[in-house]
Regions:
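Basic, low-complexity segments
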Residues: 1-25
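An anionic, glycine-rich sequence signature occurring as long contiguous blocks
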Residues: 14, 122, 138-170, 174, ...
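Electropositive nucleic-acid engagement tracts
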Residues: 25-29, 35, 39-108, 187, ...
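Short, conserved catalytic/metal-binding motifs centered on acidic residues
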Residues: 52-53, 93-106, 133, 199-207, ...
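Active-site-proximal, Lys/Arg-enriched surface segment
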Residues: 69-152, 158-159, 164, 299-302
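Short, basic/hydrophobic alpha-helical segments
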Residues: 80-87, 169-197
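Acidic, metal-coordinating catalytic cores used for nucleic-acid/nucleotide bond scission
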Residues: 200-208, 228-230, 377
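Short, solvent-exposed helix-loop connector elements
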Residues: 334, 340-349, 364-380, 400-403
């Protein structure tokens, strides 16, 4: 028996689920995916297989096999999900957002589990880590792709690699979180379902010159947070290709500092030296607290890439407005052109809150972290269906025109 809240949504959920039917191969898989999706949308305290099976009237063992072992196309579901999100939330000013989140675990048998750092957990803990791609636009925001991070040491352990409980395919090779992020960005842009001109991320991703270069090659602008120690030049770095050494020496091809070259500086030191008149107050939207005011400053710089001059772009700095100016100053790098407005640059740089809120909503409302499967395939299957449930409820939220945030049940009907 379905809850009254979900009963009103069931026709729309059936239509939504039908979009993904071709990725489940057999009728049994389509039926199981429908029931699991309903279970994720229901207000169940703990959305594991047993509890979902009990609430939706499905055999637990069959649902477990569907999640852990059935070879359905979860990547195909992600492509269709991105098309749905593009239809519902797409806008020319869309932004792709990168971040990772941890999934605490008590056991040692899950794929990729181990003591590792998790920014969302705020500590080193026994957990799995997933790298995620979000999409944000003026119409809303949600999660649109996922990758399970498998540490190099974990993959190099023969016992873990051969574990039947983790069941990691032999074809899976080590990839850094940055590489996983790049895979998702590339795939999303190549699919073309999500209109997005920008990419943003925190310093864990923004510090990577290689990832920034990938975004540029993909034809997008980035505005990413970077560490305060990141070095740039505020003027011509005065590097050039040195002349041939003698008449018979080989022509030189690599740029080197000229005698009048100035050293690169840490962005933190550059920002601290800015005059007060360089700071301009702007209001930006940031999470459940609504619009907030910050002070921003920016200047054109040359990025330092692998110890040499890289592309020219913007250094953006943000500090709290008013009496909190002694608080942490955040710095960003962007490859946007000189003509881009400060207001747009500031808005994009401050959009990382969207993926943080989506992690909180997905874990609290659609059971993103409630899974109890250990297999590599099981992780991808559960997370994929949770992303589908989240996007569906986000679309319902938009249709109803009702605010949905932590503490407000996703399935609650609009007020009369």
């Amino acid at each position: 028996m379905l809850d009254a809240d979900l009963a009103a949504l069931l026709p729309a959920l059936e239509t939504f689920h039908a979009r993904f039917g071709r990725f489940f191969r057999r009728s049994e898989g389509r039926a199981a995916s429908r029931k699991y999706l309903i279970g994720l949308a229901l207000p169940i305290e703990r959305k594991n297989v047993e509890n979902i099976a009990e609430r939706v009237g499905a055999p637990p063992r069959k649902l477990q096999e569907f999640l852990s072992d059935s070879p359905w196309d979860d990547d195909g579901c992600i492509g269709e999900l991105q098309q749905f999100v593009g239809e519902q939330l797409g806008a020319p000013g869309g932004v792709l957002v990168l971040d990772d989140t941890g999934f605490p675990k008590k056991g040692i048998h899950s794929a990729g589990v181990g003591r590792q750092s998790s920014g969302t957990l705020g500590r080193v803990d026994n957990c799995q880590v997933g790298v995620f791609l979000g999409y944000a636009s003026p119409h809303g925001h949600t999660l649109v792709d996922r990758r399970l991070y498998l540490a190099e040491g974990w993959l190099a352990d023969p016992a873990k690699r051969a574990s039947r409980r983790a069941a990691v395919p032999e074809t899976v090779r080590f990839a850094t979180k940055l590489e996983l992020a790049g895979e998702m960005l590339t795939a999303a842009i190549e699919r073309g379902h999500l209109p997005a001109g920008w990419v943003t991320a925190d310093a864990a991703y923004g510090d990577s010159a290689d990832l920034r270069a990938l975004v540029a090659r993909l034809g997008r602008w980035y505005c990413v947070e970077v560490s305060g120690t990141t070095e740039v030049w505020t003027a011509d770095p005065a590097w050039a290709v040195p002349p041939r050494a003698g008449r018979t020496g080989r022509p030189r091809t690599k740029v080197r500092p000229r005698s009048d070259a100035t050293p690169a500086q840490a962005v933190r030191e550059i920002v601290r030296a800015l005059p007060e008149e360089a700071w301009i107050r702007h209001r930006v939207t940031e999470g459940e607290k609504g619009p907030r005011e910050y002070e921003f400053a920016r200047l054109r710089v040359v990025e330092k890439v692998h110890r040499a001059p890289g592309p020219e772009g913007w250094l953006l700095a943000r500090r709290p407005a008013g009496s909190d100016q002694a608080a942490e100053i955040k710095c960003y790098l962007s490859n946007a052109p000189a003509t881009v407005a400060l207001a747009e640059l500031a808005a994009v740089g401050c959009l990382r809150w969207t993926i943080e809120e989506d992690f909180e909503l997905a874990k609290g409302e659609v059971g993103l972290d409630h899974y109890e499967v250990t297999k590599f395939r099981g992780w991808y299957h559960h997370i994929t269906l949770a992303l589908l449930a989240l996007a569906f409820l986000k679309a319902v939220q938009r249709e109803w025109g009702k605010k949905w945030g932590p503490g407000i049940r996703a399935g609650d009907p609009p007020a009369a």
